[in-house]
C-alpha cells in the first residue's frame, strides 16, 4: 500500500518515523491544520501493513472524539464495551459507562488509520527503517536503509524502544514497563468477558509483590470471539519487590485452562512518561510510546492520538515563527487534556503502588470519564 514518489532524491520538510496511531495522528492533524506542511511530510514505517502490535486493543478515553474531529470512521471488526470489572482478591467492583471502550485488533486498526491518511495524500514508505541522523546547519540529515533525507523536523513515533529517542541521547533514565500477553479463543466455561461485553482488570497480583495488574480483554479475531490475556508490571516504585511476572501469569492462565508454552507468549515494553523526562530537542519531537504514557496502567491509544494533535500544533507554530527549538512542546502537552490526565494518573499510581490505597478505589478514578 506504499504511496511512492518517483523523485527519490526529494528532500521533505518533515519526517515521521513510525506508522502507528501516534505517527498517523500527527500527519492527519497536520493535514487538517496546515495541508501545505502535510504535503511536505514523509512517513516511514519499518514493516508492511498489516503488522502485529502487542496491545490490549482498547480504544478508550477520548479517542473517539479525536477520530471524529479528524473525520475518521474505521470500518473494522470491533466490540463495544460498557463495563470495567476491577478485582482485588475476593473483592470486586464494576464501573459502568456506555461504550467506554471499543475493542479492536491493532493490526487492523493501524492499517485502517494508515489507509485514511493515504487517501488524503500521505507519502508513506513501508519497509523503510530509520538508522541515524546528523545535524546539518539548522536541519537534520536522516539516513534510512533506503536513502538519505534533509529535513527541518523529525518526529519519533517508533514506539517504546524508539531508535529516534536512542539517537537523541537524552539524559533521563527510561521507565520501561514489561508486559506479557497471549490471545486465546474464548472458552465460555472460563471466560465470561466476551459474552458479558466487559474488560477485567485484576490487581490481586499486588499481594504477591507485583506493581501492576492482569487484564482480560475480549475482541474479535478471524470472525471468532477471542480474549486477550496479559500482565503488566509497572514498577512505579523501584525500591519495592518486582514480583514474579511469569509465575503469576502462568498461574492465571492455568486457572482458565489455558496451556500455551512460554515461548509463544508475546512480550514488549510500555514506556511511561516521568515528570522530568525530556521529549524534544531542536528539530526533534517524540510522540506516543516513544515519549511515554501514564504510569498507573500504561494505557496508550488515546495518548498516541493526543500526542499527534499536540505535535502537529507545535510543528505548525515552529514553521510560522521559524523557530525549531521546540522548547514549548512539553508544556503544550502538559496543558492538553492528555497531559492533565497523565498528571492525574501519576498521582494515582503513587496512591496505588506506594501508598497502598485500595486498588478498587484507585481504578475507578483512573477510568472514570468526566
Give the location of each predicted region.
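Short beta-strand to alpha-helix junction loop
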Residues: 56, 96-116, 236-244
Amino acid at each position: 500500500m506504499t504511496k511512492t514518489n518517483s523523485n527519490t532524491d526529494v528532500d521533505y520538510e518533515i519526517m515521521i518515523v513510525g506508522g502507528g496511531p501516534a505517527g498517523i495522528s500527527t500527519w492527519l492533524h497536520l493535514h487538517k491544520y496546515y495541508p501545505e506542511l502535510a504535503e511536505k511530510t514523509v512517513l516511514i514505517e519499518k514493516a508492511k501493513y498489516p503488522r502485529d502490535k502487542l496491545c490490549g486493543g482498547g480504544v478508550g478515553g477520548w479517542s473517539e472524539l479525536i477520530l471524529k474531529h479528524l473525520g475518521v470512521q474505521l470500518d473494522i471488526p470491533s466490540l463495544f464495551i460498557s463495563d470495567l470489572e476491577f478485582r482485588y482478591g475476593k473483592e470486586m467492583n464494576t464501573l459502568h459507562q456506555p461504550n467506554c471502550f471499543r475493542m479492536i485488533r491493532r493490526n487492523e486498526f493501524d492499517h485502517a488509520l494508515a489507509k485514511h491518511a493515504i487517501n488524503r495524500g500521505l507519502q508513506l514508505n513501508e519497509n523503510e527503517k530509520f538508522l541515524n541522523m546528523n545535524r546539518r546547519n539548522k536541519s537534520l540529515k536522516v539516513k534510512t536503509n533506503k536513502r538519505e533525507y534533509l529535513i527541518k523536523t523529525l518526529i519519533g513515533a517508533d514506539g517504546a524502544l524508539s531508535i529516534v529517542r536512542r539517537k537523541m541521547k537524552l539524559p533521563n533514565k527510561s521507565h520501561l514497563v514489561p508486559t506479557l500477553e497471549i490471545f486465546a479463543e474464548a472458552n465460555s466455561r472460563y471466560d465470561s468477558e466476551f459474552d458479558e461485553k466487559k474488560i477485567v482488570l485484576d490487581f490481586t497480583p499486588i499481594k504477591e509483590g507485583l506493581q501492576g495488574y492482569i487484564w482480560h480483554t475480549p475482541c474479535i479475531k478471524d470472525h471468532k470471539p477471542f480474549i486477550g490475556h496479559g500482565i503488566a508490571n509497572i514498577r512505579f516504585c523501584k525500591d519495592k519487590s518486582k514480583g514474579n511476572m511469569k509465575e503469576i501469569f502462568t498461574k492465571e492462565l492455568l486457572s482458565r485452562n489455558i496451556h500455551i508454552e512460554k515461548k509463544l507468549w508475546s512480550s514488549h515494553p510500555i514506556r511511561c512518561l516521568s515528570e522530568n523526562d525530556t521529549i524534544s530537542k531542536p528539530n526533534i519531537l517524540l510522540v506516543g510510546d516513544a515519549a511515554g504514557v501514564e504510569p498507573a496502567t500504561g494505557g496508550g491509544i488515546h495518548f498516541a492520538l493526543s500526542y499527534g494533535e499536540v505535535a502537529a500544533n507545535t510543528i505548525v507554530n515552529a514553521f510560522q515563527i521559524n523557530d525549531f527549538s521546540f522548547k514549548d512542546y512539553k508544556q503544550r502537552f502538559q496543558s492538553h487534556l492528555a497531559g492533565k490526565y497523565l498528571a492525574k494518573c501519576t498521582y494515582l499510581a503513587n496512591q496505588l503502588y506506594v501508598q497502598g490505597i485500595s486498588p478498587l478505589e484507585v481504578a475507578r478514578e483512573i477510568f472514570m470519564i468526566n
